[in-house]
């Protein structure tokens, strides 16, 4: 585990095995954990991308690598770094701002 991961990196992650309604398969995921935690821990906090863009308030529409889809904030999870297959890119600045707003809305007390 010598790889370093940063907030806003997009990584390809094997999310299997899963249970119930957890999002499955190997798919791109956005790292949202702070860099200090990414460096210190064996875990990452990620948000999976999905090609199914449902009209949920917890979905952020994307066009990552020219593939329409969404970030599934309702599926945010902590994973062990051993689930990461490779780094796939970074989220662009406009989507970072939108992702921060969505995270704030999800975890605010209002």
Regions found by a protein language model. Give the residues of each.
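Conserved functional hotspots at enzyme active or ligand-binding sites that engage polyanionic ligands
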Residues: 1-110
């Amino acid at each position: 585990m010598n790889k370093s991961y940063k907030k806003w990196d997009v990584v390809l992650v094997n999310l299997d095995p899963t249970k119930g309604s957890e999002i499955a398969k190997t798919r791109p995921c956005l790292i949202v954990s702070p860099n200090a935690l990414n460096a210190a821990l064996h875990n990452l906090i990620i948000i999976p991308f999905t090609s199914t863009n449902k009209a949920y308030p917890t979905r952020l529409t994307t066009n990552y690598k020219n593939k329409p889809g969404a970030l599934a904030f309702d599926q945010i999870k902590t994973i062990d770094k051993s689930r990461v297959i490779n780094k796939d890119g970074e989220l662009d600045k406009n989507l970072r701002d939108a992702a921060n707003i969505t995270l704030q809305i999800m975890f605010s007390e209002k």
